[in-house]
């Protein structure tokens, strides 16, 4: 049985929730069959929005930070899942090279790295940290908020060019916790004898949100048929616009007209189900991450009325990458609250196992806004006691 998260949404069960609960045995079997055909991501985190009438993933991170925000009670589950995941790729693994993001001054992110090292060390692996940054030329100590140290070491290629590791450390598996927004690292390309997880093409230099949601659209149709619900209740509508330049206004007409089309589709669904909320669209950089390059739009005219500050925010994202492609996503309200502040659940998986989650809470935001923004904090999600593993 998959552990059940405890939700902050109180009140009577919505029709969607009833259907999911009633179909639990069929859902478990469906997942079992799907995992036999498809390889799950090595690990991921999924942002969910729960509007009661609709429960949908709105973002999936294949290089998840934030493991430090999970409840420590879930650590044994993470270790168990990590063991199973590593055994798939390298049953004889002894050494694991973990490659974190480059922003080593972010204390919260470093705590995530510490937790990941803890998880994989408890599987029995030797774990060390590597970097492809040209600034890391020797073992470099990185101070943690609690006064302890991490050591970051330069990645080197083996003499035959077929493996990568550290000077005196030959890993079976290389685990990326770096989303490669700035481009693919040449030092990890064309490795023939090691598993690089997730694969390089999962990084933002290649991956696009619009491709992800096109694939999810197919999955949602199958799943909706299985539990007898409209797939729309599990899946946000989306569209895509390319050749955008927020600074010189090029592509603006295309963006505004596509926002109009999407809003009309959402209004039609809201009318069908008697939903009184006001529809909105979230415009995101198609290769965006860290909550950057995101804006909420309730009317197409807002696209043409962006001020300089808003344009600057949309034009450039992580690692200075310029935005030229955007995904337009149906906005999903969140009706969940923690201590009267708006909240959304973020669920973490290793391989096919749910290993925990937390509420992203933001007192400065409303139910129709992006919560991954300044002012947010995290509250670990508990699992329902009777389902914990």
Language-model features: where?
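Short Pro/Gly-enriched beta-strand edge/turn motifs at strand-loop
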Residues: 26-36, 324-332
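Conserved catalytic alpha/beta cores of large enzymes that bind or transform nucleotide phosphates
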Residues: 86-103, 374-389
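Low-complexity, highly charged intrinsically disordered N-terminal segments
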Residues: 1-28, 38, 44-45, 51-56, ...
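Conserved hydrophobic helix-helix packing surfaces used for dimerization/oligomerization
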Residues: 95-98, 174, 281
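Short solvent-exposed loop/turn micro-motifs enriched in small/polar/acidic residues
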Residues: 39-42, 120, 167, 339-342
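Conserved N-proximal alpha/beta basic substrate-recognition cap immediately N-terminal to
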Residues: 80-81, 104-277
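Phosphate-binding site of ATP-dependent enzymes
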Residues: 54, 257-280, 286-383
């Amino acid at each position: 049985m998959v552990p059940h998260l405890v939700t902050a949404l109180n009140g009577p069960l919505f029709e969607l929730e009833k259907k999911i609960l009633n179909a639990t045995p069929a859902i478990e079997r469906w997942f079992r069959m799907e995992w036999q055909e498809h390889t799950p991501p090595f690990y991921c985190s999924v942002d969910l929005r729960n509007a009661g009438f609709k429960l949908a993933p709105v973002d999936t991170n294949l290089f998840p930070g934030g493991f430090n925000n999970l409840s420590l009670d879930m650590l044994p589950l993470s270790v168990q899942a990590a063991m199973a995941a590593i055994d798939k790729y390298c049953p004889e693994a002894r050494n694991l090279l973990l490659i974190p993001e480059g922003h080593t001054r972010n204390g919260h992110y470093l705590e995530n790295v510490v937790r990941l090292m803890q998880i994989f060390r408890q599987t029995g692996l030797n774990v060390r940290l590597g970097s492809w940054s040209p600034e890391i030329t020797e073992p470099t100590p990185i101070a943690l908020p609690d006064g302890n140290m991490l050591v970051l070491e330069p990645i080197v290629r083996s003499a035959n060019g077929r493996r990568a590791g550290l000077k005196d450390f030959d890993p079976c598996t290389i685990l990326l916790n770096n989303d490669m927004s700035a481009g693919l690292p040449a030092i990890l390309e064309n490795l023939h004898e090691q598993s690089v997880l997730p694969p390089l093409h999962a990084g933002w230099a290649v991956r696009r949100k619009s491709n992800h949601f096109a694939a999810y659209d197919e999955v949602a149709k199958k799943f909706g048929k299985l539990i007898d619900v409209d797939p729309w209740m599990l899946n946000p509508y989306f569209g895509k616009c390319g050749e955008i330049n927020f600074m010189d206004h090029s592509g603006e007409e295309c963006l505004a007209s596509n926002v109009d089309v999407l809003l009309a589709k959402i209004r039609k669904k809201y009318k069908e189900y008697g939903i009184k909320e006001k529809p909105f669209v979230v415009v995101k950089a198609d290769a965006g991450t860290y909550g950057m390059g995101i804006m909420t739009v309730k009317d197409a005219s807002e696209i043409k009325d962006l001020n300089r500050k808003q344009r600057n925010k949309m034009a450039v994202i992580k690692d200075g990458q310029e935005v030229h492609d955007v995904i337009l996503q149906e906005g999903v309200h969140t009706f969940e609250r923690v201590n009267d502040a708006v909240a959304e659940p973020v669920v973490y998986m290793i391989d096919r196992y749910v290993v925990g989650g937390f509420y992203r809470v933001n007192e400065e935001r409303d139910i129709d806004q992006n919560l991954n923004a300044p002012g947010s904090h995290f509250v670990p999600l508990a699992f329902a006691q009777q389902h914990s593993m």
